[in-house]
């Protein structure tokens, strides 16, 4: 059985690393919570009023709500792992954090992949029978695909609660050349089971996202070149919109892949718990959902208008409270 063993002491992490990790990841998580919470509130209010949400808005509602839960959970995990290490390294607590983190991340990766597939089918233009078939069927199938994604995420996340992680704390490790002792945190990770369940849960949405993003970029680039050949000019608003969409899609394709890699490295304990590499993984994992939520607001005219109204109303509300 292939296992990865790590150990750490309280001396292995400096106050600077603790502060840096909490501040940077905290800013990212709070940004993501505000962005995801705003999108959830806008679409959730429409759904609560009995309105039928369009397919794209429905995907964004589920994606934003799951991200809201994810980033709250990530903040809690960072606080416990850095400030309450004895509690965090109890086996049941540690496994709970890991399993729910993987489940929420898998769900987010699925929802993000379906959103990219939906936009690709709606915007891109390819003369292929399969593409036309998917374009016609996607609206009917999407509610079932979203439900199936949650079930798949559950199926490949909760088995991680058995025979994958084992952590414990030894509070009586003798310090050489001293009569005192120190706490040492040990972790064991069954890499065979982790790699199997993690890859099974992430492989399909990762391939879907890469294919959909690549097809969307190719279609937009082809259309942009066509517009350029017709001498519409690089300053044309439509041309700028296409170039902006290509850049945004390329950026989040790269960040999506990095997020998937960072999640695996962080979960597998390949790096020491308090190493700079593990801290970098935590920062990347918090950056992707936060950045994508902000981009969704800025790139959606309806959400952008709602955000401007919100910004205008908050000062008025606060002013009324002080009177």
From Swiss-Prot:
Keyword Transmembrane tagged: yes
Gene3D superfamilies in the record: Rhodopsin 7-helix transmembrane proteins (1.20.1070.10)
BP GO annotations: detection of chemical stimulus involved in sensory perception of bitter taste
Record membrane topology: Multi-pass membrane protein
Subcellular localization: Membrane
Regions of this protein lying in the Cytoplasmic compartment: 36-58, 122-140, 212-247, 298-323
One CC-aspect GO term: membrane
The protein, known as: Taste receptor type 2 member 40
Species annotation: Homo sapiens (Human)
